[in-house]
Every structure is written in C-alpha cells, then in structure tokens.
Amino acid sequence: MQIEKVYEPQRFEPHWAQWWIDSNIFRANPESPGRVFSLVIPPPNVTGVLHIGHMLEHTEIDVSTRWHRMLGDNTLWLPGTDHAGIATQMVVARQLKEEGINYRDLGREKFEERVWQWKAQSGDTIKRQMVRLGASCDWSRERFTLDPGLSRAVREVFVSLYERGLLYRGEYMTNWCPSCNTAISDLEVAHADVAGHLWHIRYPVNGMPGRFVTVATTRPETMLGDTAIAVNAKDPRYQDLHGKTVQLPLMDREIPIILDDLADPQFGTGVVKVTPAHDPNDFEAGKRHNLAKIQVIDNNARMTAAAGPYAGLDRFDARKRVVSALEEIGALVKVEDYPLSLGKCDRCKTPVEPLISTQWFVKTKPLAEKAIAVVESGEIGFVPQNWTKTYYEWMYNIRDWCVSRQLWWGHRIPAWHCGECKEIIVAREAPKACPRCASENLTQDTDVLDTWFSSGLWPFSTLGWPDQTADLAKYYPTTLLITGFDILFFWVARMVMFGLEFMGEVPFKQVYIHGLVRDADRQKMSKTKGNVIDPLVVTEKYGTDAVRMALLQGAAPGTDIVLTEERMESSRAFANKIWNAARFLFMNADQSAAAPAEPTIEDRWIVSRLNAAAETANRAIEQYRYHELAQELWKFFWHEFCDWYLELKKVSATGWGNAVAAFETALRLLHPAMPFLTEELWQRLERKEGDPKSIALAQYPQYRAELADSEAEKEVAIIQEIVTLARTLRTESKLDPKQQLKGALYCRTASLAIAQRHADAIQKIARTTLEFKAEAPPKADVIRSTVEFDLVLDVPKVEEDPARKQKEREQLEKNIANSKRQLGDEVFLSKAPAKVVDSIRAKLVDYEAQLAKML
C-alpha cells in the first residue's frame, strides 16, 4: 500500500477530528459494562480562546481518557464552558462602549440579550479549538454553566443552603472593586508587595492642653472617617487617657479613646485609629464598641459628602490633599517609607477598597470540616502530594464566602424582597405573594452569584442533578480531576465542599495538579513579555501531535514545563520518523499476504521490547508521569523500532507480516499521546473482521510475561554493541559514515558464536567487513573495547586538517563555557531536574577530556 512521501499533518488532522465526533467514537453509554472512568473538564471561560496552558491540561486529560477507553473502561470526559460573570460582562460592556453605548443605559434585560447574542457568536470558539486539538470529549454532553438544567441546580443549592442555615445575608466588610463595581471574594484579591509610606499624625487630647497621641497610618485619607482612637488597656503609657476623647484633625470631630486589643503595645506608638467603614479589623472593633460607621469613600473610589471639603475627589488625590492639609496645621509628625501588601482585583488589577455592604454569604466552616476529613482519610488524594498541605492551610483558615456580585450577567440570586413589609423570600421559583403580608409587590434581588458558585456544582450538575439520572448514578463520583494549582481554592475545594454536602460523596477520587508552561528562559508566559505561544499557530506549523508530544516530554509531576520551538521541531521530526517507518513497511509488505511467518531474531526482539515499553507506558499513565510515557515512546519508536529493528529487517528481508503486526501494536501504544498520526496510519492497515472502526477503541497493549524474550534481547544487544563500537571508531577517526571498512573482532567468550551467527547483519549495518577471532587483540592504533569485545579497524591514514582541528577545539571550549555557566547558575540548579544537572556535569567531564587530548 502506498503512503504519501511527505508527512503533512494539516492534511489529515482536521478530517479525523471531525470523523471521531461524527462516528460517536467518544460517546459514553451509562448502560455499557466495564469499570467506570469519568472526569469533567475545568470549564474554560466562554470569553476566551485556548492558550498553551489549556493545551497542556487538555493533552494530559486526553492521554488518560484515551488510555482508559482503550482499556475497555466505560469512559466519559464531559466538556463545557463557564459563563465567567465579571469577565464576560466586561467584554460586552467594552464592545457597547466602542459603539457609544453605556451598558447601564441599555438596562438589564437588553444588556442580557446582548450578552446572549455575543455568546451565540463566539461561544463555540473553545469547542472548535478543542476539537481541532484532538480532545476526546463526549460532545453530546457538552454543558454551559447557564444552561437551564445547571441553573436549576444552582437555585436548588442556594435555597437548600439557606434552609440548612448555611447561607445568610448581612452587612459586612467586603473587598470592593471600584472598576468592576462589585464585591469580590478574598480569593479574587491578588496581593502585591509595594513600596508605601507610613504617615504619623498627631491627635490632640481634649481637656488636656498640650497632650497629643500619635497615630501611624498607611491610608491618611481614611482618617476623615475615624470614629475612635484605640489604646491597649495594659499599655502603661496611656493609663491617664482611659475615658478621654481626642479631636479629629481636619474634621473637628470629637471621637472617643477606646480600650481594645486592636492596639498592640509592641507595634508603633501603641495607638491606632479606628475607621469601621474602611478596614475589616476596625469594622469588628466598631461592633464591639458600638461605634458609628462613617463611609468617606464610595463604590467608585471617590470621596463621599461625609469627607467634607474632599468630597468628589478620587481617593488617591484626596490622600495628597489630606497630607498637605495635615502638614499645614502641624499635625503631620513624620513620614517614613513602609513596605505594603497591596490588594488588587485579580481580574482588572485595580486596588480594592474595603467597604461595608449588604451581601450574601455561605458559612464555609461546617462545609470545610467535612472537606478536610475526606482528604485526611485518603478518599481524595492529591498528586503531587505536597498540594495536600496547601489545601489544608487554606481550609483550616477558611472564612465565610461572599457569594453575591453586583453584576447583571450570571445566576440571579433566587431571593425576592417584599416592598411592603421588607420580608426576604428565598425560593426555588418566583413567589406570587409575600407569605408574611400577602403583598404582591415583590422584587427579585438584583445581584448575581459568584461564578465559582455554579462551577462548584460542576461534577454533579452536569450529570443531571437534582434529578436522579442514569448519568449521575453511573459517572458520579468522577474518577479524576486534572487542573492547575491556581484554582485549587477557587474551584477544587468548593467542589469538594458542595459534593459532600449535596451528594454525600466526594466529587472525584484523585486530583492531579499540573505545572505552568514556561518559555526557554523558564519565564512565565504573558502578553506583556511577548513570549506567549498560541497553540493553534504552533499546531498549524508543527502538527497537533508534535506539540502534544513536546508538552508531554516536560510534564513531570511537580514541575513546570519548558516549551521551545526547538522541542516542537524535534517532536515533529519524531512524527516524521514514524511516518517514514510506515512508508518503508508499506512499500515492503504485501499486506494482503502479510500473514505472520516464523519470527526472526529481530522479530522476537522487537516483540520483547514492545512488551517492555507497554509495561512502562501503562505504569507512566497510571501514575500521571506523562514525561516518562513520552520518553518511553520516543526511545521505542526512534531508537529501537526505526534505528535497529528496521535496519535488521532490511538485512533479513523476510517476515514482513511480523513487522506490520509489531507496527500495529506500536501504533496502539502511541495513540493516547499522538492520536491523529496513529489513526491515519492505523486506518491504512488491513482491517480484520471484528476490528473496531477506530484505533481509539482498540485494545491498549499490556505487558505479558510470556512475550519477554531474554535470549533475543541478549543476541540483539550483542549486535548493537559491536555495531556501536564500529560507529564510534568511525566517528573518532573522522571517517565518512558510508565508507566501507575492514577490521577484526576479538572475543574469548561464548558471545563470539552469537556474533558470528549474525555476522551478515553486523557487517552490513556497520559497513565493515570483519574477521571473527577467538583470541586477544594485538596492539593497534584504532581499537575500541567493551567487556567482551575488542574491535580493531584498518583505517587509512588521513592528513589532519589544521583548520578543522582548530574549529573543533573552539567548539569544545564553547561547550565547556556553556556547561560551566549553567552549573554556576543557582536559579537554574534550584529548578532543573536532577537528571538534567547530572547530564550537564557528565558532558562537561567529557568535553574537558576531549580538549585535553587535543592539547
């Protein structure tokens, strides 16, 4: 059978991507027998496109999914997207702004219609990209977090939490983003260390002329809302101030001196200002002492009327004006540099403002206790295991979760406010009248739920809950979750809490946390650095399978992945090698008559090596050691199948049916990692009755003890050893690899007979005519030895080229310098795998030895 000369993955990859879907290859059936393997996708935001981090994640998921499917498991990978509340609203609001429309002027209903229109136009982008990249999802079960069924699940959970006393509404200090104009959770605040200042301000004590207390603050603009000064009751410096008041500078307001542990005698002056409306600790102190809450900064980060002459100013402009005014009246004692941890909105990077607002909260402590217990008991395991500690640290220190957002896009909170008696009715469906006063003047809460609320239900809401569906019964709990560390708390922990609360079972049994994809300099990829790799661009350039293999090569648990153009180019060469191997086989094998013949020594050897590779590959996938899978596949296909087996086959030129059979098994072994290439080649092989219609449904090779052939492995190892000796001598003697040579092989063990038995193969592959001698070797200029063999070559004398020698010396010196630079780089040594560092050290020793010979 003929196969195209040039490997062009762009020609066949789109075809198979669509064919798999059209042929229902990945469709799961809850009634099918077999062990269940199920997982859900971490739903990408509907606003986005796939980045290289997605491709890493999806490749790892796909490898595990395809492997389980080929093991015969009842396999489901459920896909979908997230409505991404804040992100989506910002995108559409920006589009409207470009059209000269303020989204608020449009009104909620019209704005929501516009968002749905936008979603219809761009919402399939993620799916198209995932399909193109080979994700073996069951697309018939694709879900969206705002689908009717999932929305019903959200309402059910919200109301149930409320009924169980685990959800409440209250006035609390929240993180407010002035740009997104909504409250955000603690996890959505990104803290950055910045250089700030500490302003020391004097407050005059009333009734004690000449007596002042000095307060240090990083936010002088908030002093306009001070309602007290606090000292510690045990601080001897301020015993005479108990029960006194001070006059608030700039505002001429009398405020009390309170006794509270908020003031630490060991920190600063031991006196703190108390601003209950603008600091979470002060808010709690205000509740303890029944202090007024004066809000001087509004939701847009501008000063309120309560700020007096500073009303209307931006908060940072107000800071400058306040500091200047304090200086003018002599109330500013000093200013000193002070490092700050500045909280910014993780999405828009605007500094957040602690503001008091009425929000909905989930009581997380009772939920977290159960979520901790299932990890402690081993019901859920983390890989790598060190993430368990991180999970515990957050769960043990968990705070109530603010779940309401001041947005229009999302799951609207199922609560209605009575316009007459102010009763709040939480219900699964819209009530017709107030149960307290019978008024029909009801208005639904305007807020929506945090996006992570609906995402937290993803493992069971996508399977039909709250209905008891066949899918839910079969595929929950899911088997595995593969995700990034950045959403361990946002998403993973919340799925555990909700799964236990509403399903009574863990949502998954194992969580594999993958690393980041970094560039050649181990830098994190970002648009600002200009080092972002677009997966669709590189897959078009190198082929999807090549990019997948390049990612898998670096995907060791607990490490980040370095992805470079060189690695992708190398992986494309690997795919091309397999393609050319197929061409060679197809040209030599008459498949219609390719019945297995009596196996030659190389046939027995390749079956044994393939058996060993299957053992390693299965173990690697099972343990999420995707890098070991890639290494084993590369070693087998390139070095064993192509470099040795096919070369030996050229010599024997028999048993092509055995070669095709081995190649077919090898394609199945490779399929989870490189699905497109393997499907293309597998479909060109002769089909037998009963064969599945896709390699994706074929059986994955398993280790079988009876296929291990130590005798064949020993004999081929001798062939390899002698050929390698000959090739090494050629290289050292700087001879043309194609030049025919003569030589003698000396051996005084039984291995000589094996070598003689395979003399034809050894001599043809080594391009060397040999004499085989059972004696010790003579002294010779061109000799190489191993434990059993000594090879002497008859090498013609060649005048050495001084220019070439100088060039080789310069290259060695360059290699030595590069190796020393890497080994002297502490950052590199701390991050590079031990194997890589050891390899560089070994190469350095070799380079220095070669250079010493030349000097």
UniProtKB/Swiss-Prot annotation:
A GO BP annotation: valyl-tRNA aminoacylation
InterPro entries the record matches: aa-tRNA-synth_I_CS, aa-tRNA-synth_Ia, Anticodon_Ia_Val, M/V/L/I-tRNA-synth_anticd-bd, Rossmann-like_a/b/a_fold, tRNA-bd_arm, tRNAsynth_Ia_anticodon-bd, Val-tRNA_synth_C_sf
GO molecular function: aminoacyl-tRNA deacylase activity; ATP binding; valine-tRNA ligase activity
Taxonomic superkingdom: Bacteria
Keyword terms: Aminoacyl-tRNA synthetase, ATP-binding, Coiled coil, Cytoplasm, Ligase, Nucleotide-binding, Protein biosynthesis
Catalytic reaction(s) noted: tRNA(Val) + L-valine + ATP = L-valyl-tRNA(Val) + AMP + diphosphate
Intervals of motif 'KMSKS' region: 524-528
Location(s), subcellular: Cytoplasm
Record function comment: Catalyzes the attachment of valine to tRNA(Val). As ValRS can inadvertently accommodate and process structurally similar amino acids such as threonine, to avoid such errors, it has a 'posttransfer' editing activity that hydrolyzes mischarged Thr-tRNA(Val) in a tRNA-dependent manner.
UniProt comment concerning the protein's domains: ValRS has two distinct active sites: one for aminoacylation and one for editing. The misactivated threonine is translocated from the active site to the editing site. The C-terminal coiled-coil domain is crucial for aminoacylation activity.
Entry-linked HAMAP family: Val_tRNA_synth_type1
NCBIfam families, A to Z: PRK05729.1 (NF004349), valS (TIGR00422)
Protein name: Valine--tRNA ligase
Organism listed in the record: Solibacter usitatus (strain Ellin6076)
Record lineage: Bacteria, Pseudomonadati, Acidobacteriota, Terriglobia, Bryobacterales
